Amino acid sequence: MPDDPIQDILDEADEEMEESVSYMRSELRTIRAGRASPAMLENVTVEYYGSQTPLEQVASVSAPQPDLIVVQPFDRNAIENIERGIMKADLGLNPNNDGEKIRIPIPPLSEERRKELVETSRERAEETKISIRNIRRDAKNEIQNVVEAENFSEDVLYGAEEDLQDITDAHTETVEGLLEQKTEQIMDV
């Protein structure tokens, strides 16, 4: 089948773009949106027996109220290190350690802080779009090389480039939708 290598390139580009969008999704989850969410602590690491360990491996994290996160360590001896890890993550949160669990009150966001968070979200979206464009560029170059090497017609090249652009547009729309959704969450008082 003459267009198999081209289809492989398109599939690979689609996969890589999806990975970029997926990474953006996880980044946006860690950006605070007014109410408490365990995802806010997703990137926190804790020193546990001499190595940096993700928080979710040493404690359970829950948000029993819209303005409170509770961290329940699996090992009580790790509670101080967990508290230190949360402070080091520089999330602007003040954990309260009662010896058994850590309570983290989530203060309401000021208008200024909301705008900063929206800007951070926009930056993440722009980084993702740049990544998608770079993947498109690389795939386009690969397609051109295959077309030249296999002596395919110009029509095959244009068709493949159109398909690649459609894939790119779909992922870019997803990024825009995620950004819009996050902006609404942040600005919703």
From Swiss-Prot:
GO terms for cellular component: cytoplasm. It is found in: Cytoplasm. One of its GO terms (molecular function) is ribosomal large subunit binding. InterPro entries: Ribosome_recyc_fac, Ribosome_recyc_fac_dom, RRF_sf. Keywords: Cytoplasm, Protein biosynthesis. One of its GO terms (biological process) is translational termination. It comes from the Bacteria. Pfam families: RRF (PF01765). The keyword Cytoplasm applies. Belongs to the RRF family. Responsible for the release of ribosomes from messenger RNA at the termination of protein biosynthesis. May increase the efficiency of translation by recycling ribosomes from one round of translation to another. PANTHER family: MITOCHONDRIAL RIBOSOME RECYCLING FACTOR PSEUDO 1, RIBOSOME RECYCLING FACTOR. This is Ribosome-recycling factor. It comes from Salinibacter ruber (strain DSM 13855 / M31). The lineage of its organism: Bacteria, Pseudomonadati, Rhodothermota, Rhodothermia, Rhodothermales. The gene is frr.
